[in-house]
Amino acid sequence: MAKNIQAIRGMNDYLPADTAIWQRIEGILKQVLAGYGYSEIRMPIVEQTPLFKRAIGEVTDVVEKEMYTFDDRNGESLTLRPEGTAGCVRAGIEHGLLYNQEQRLWYIGPMFRYERPQKGRYRQFHQLGAEVFGLQGPDIDAELILLTARWWRALGISEHVQLELNSIGSLDARADYREALVTFLEQHVDVLDEDCKRRMYSNPLRVLDSKNPDVQLLLNDAPKLSDYLDDESKQHFAGLCELLNQAGIPYTVNERLVRGLDYYNRTVFEWVTNSLGAQGTVCAGGRYDGLVEQLGGRATPAVGFAMGLERLVLLVQAVNPEFKVPATIDVYLISSGEGTQSAAMQLAERVRDVLPTLKLMTNYGGGNFKKQITRADKWGARVALILGESEVAAQQVVVKDLRNGEQETLAQADVAARLALMLG
């Protein structure tokens, strides 16, 4: 007997029971994005490897350890995208969307990172990202945060997420801070674990979000990034905080929040939750005003965020039991007797012509009346349409309300209008 082939570790199948809740959540997310004037963009899953090395930074965990990279048959190095911002910027430059233009874009789809699979973190995962190009004030940063806060309210999870903010300043300001931080770490190298020692010179800001308790204790005495910010970054951050205060959005300034990708500057933010066990990030982003130029375009201010959908779905299911998925089927069409199958098929098509959004399933599995009613219940149908030989001959149909058991016989020409009343 042949061995079963199974899904790759960390890359999951999502079955109909799963995709129903995904579709409802995604529908809410997309509706809010449309309400803020964002347009969808779709990029390839595979990009040239240098794109991510230049955008994310060669000395990052993503590039060093986590990317799925391979050579194609022409020897070109390609990578399954580990995130969406780099590809979005590449597409914007390539198609002339960015220079001297304002763009508000969103994308959704699978990303790939070779990580240890755990709850809410997988090797193939799904992100929804939003990116804004051509606007540099703190007001658009604030609007992105307001957009995400509207999502949380719509999903019923507002009480279970907290906003953390920081400013990491300009490139020059970070260079000065980096020098001061390295000097401090060198004086306490005995406290650092191997990972922090490796990062100390290659990417010292990443030491700030070490999970090692001893390192966290040490960092209480480390130089503060806020003391090294340039005046423009300070003003930008103060403006953002004031806008959020006026909008009634609570937040915490977390001076150790630096994000794991090298392209960020000024504003960085995360929405975090404690409702999935250990604290986890649900949504994160910030400014990346230098990335467009870094990837070959004209200097363009930019800001955006990305959200992991697996973790969001888990959070909604964990904290909002009232979040329900609509029934798969509204109406189940039952037929029994000689010549009724064709009549049922034709009736179903006529009803769909009048009610195109109706979810109507026709029974094609045979079986007696009782079995077909059981199938209707299994699919969650609210109404059954029943066709027997006598109904077909008389151009009629029995309409049965499966919630209260009441039924009536109608002319087939009237059934669509009746269904609209019953299900409206």
From Swiss-Prot:
Q: Which domain of life is it from?
A: Bacteria
Q: Would I find Cytoplasm among this entry's keywords?
A: yes
* Chain segments annotated as transmembrane: none
Task: Give yes or no: UniProt keyword Aminoacyl-tRNA synthetase.
Answer: yes
One GO term under biological process is: histidyl-tRNA aminoacylation
- Its Enzyme Commission number(s) read 6.1.1.21
Q: Which UniProt keywords apply?
A: Aminoacyl-tRNA synthetase, ATP-binding, Cytoplasm, Ligase, Nucleotide-binding, Protein biosynthesis
Question: What is the catalytic activity of this protein?
Answer: tRNA(His) + L-histidine + ATP = L-histidyl-tRNA(His) + AMP + diphosphate + H(+)
Q: Which enzyme type, at the first EC level?
A: ligase
What InterPro entries would the database entry show?
aa-tRNA-synth_II, aa-tRNA-synth_II/BPL/LPL, Anticodon-bd, Anticodon-bd_dom_sf, His-tRNA-ligase, HisRS-like_core, HisRS/HisZ, HisRS_anticodon
Q: Which GO terms describe its molecular function?
A: ATP binding; histidine-tRNA ligase activity
Q: Listed GO cellular component terms?
A: cytoplasm
The record's comment on protein family reads: Belongs to the class-II aminoacyl-tRNA synthetase family.
Assembly and partners? Homodimer.
Q: What is this protein called?
A: Histidine--tRNA ligase
